[in-house]
Amino acid sequence: MAKVKYAYKEEDRSGTARASATHLKISPKHAVEICREIRGMELEKAKKYLEEVIRMERPVAFKRYNRKVGHRRGLNGWASGRYPVKAAGQILKVLENAEANAEYKGLDTEKLRIIHISSHRGPVIRGWIPRAFGRATPFNTPTTHVQIVLGEA
């Protein structure tokens, strides 16, 4: 597998911890909206927010990919939103991995803040579903790459 560089450039890595996940079977559009929402948050607040999204108690505002997205209660200053449960669960796992990396490096986990989080489209896993009369319909699965950098605030 090829070495993947981080989109975030840093000179001194002593005060930061990183984690990434590739080829996650989640929607790239949902991942972009979640990353935008938790970017800059403190680690504990971000984890709590993602857990609330998974329990469908708090929606994620869809600001870019919001065509035909219904309104949700609890969004301040924005109407359209959704509950991307699957994407929130996968991003939460990567966030917990970054926290474990920070703990291993000896950083104070109480002071950690998300200084960089990004998601990029990965390759599409091609598939198909057999249909009547010998035909087939494409059934593709999008993948997503996620990168997280935590730093002490």
Curated annotation (Swiss-Prot):
PANTHER family: 60S RIBOSOMAL PROTEIN L17
BP GO annotations: cytoplasmic translation
Alphabetic keyword roster: Ribonucleoprotein, Ribosomal protein, RNA-binding, rRNA-binding
Gene: rpl22
Disulfide partners: none
Stored Pfam families: Ribosomal_L22
Keyword Ribosomal protein: yes
Residue intervals passing through the bilayer: none
Gene Ontology CC terms: cytosolic large ribosomal subunit
Domain of life where this protein originates: Archaea
Family: Belongs to the universal ribosomal protein uL22 family.
Protein name: Large ribosomal subunit protein uL22
Species, as recorded: Methanothermobacter thermautotrophicus (strain ATCC 29096 / DSM 1053 / JCM 10044 / NBRC 100330 / Delta H) (Methanobacterium thermoautotrophicum)
Record-linked InterPro entries: Ribosomal_uL22, Ribosomal_uL22_CS, Ribosomal_uL22_euk/arc, Ribosomal_uL22_sf
The keyword GTP-binding appears for this protein: no
Assembly information from the UniProt record: Part of the 50S ribosomal subunit.
Single GO molecular function: rRNA binding
Function, as annotated: This protein binds specifically to 23S rRNA. It makes multiple contacts with different domains of the 23S rRNA in the assembled 50S subunit and ribosome.
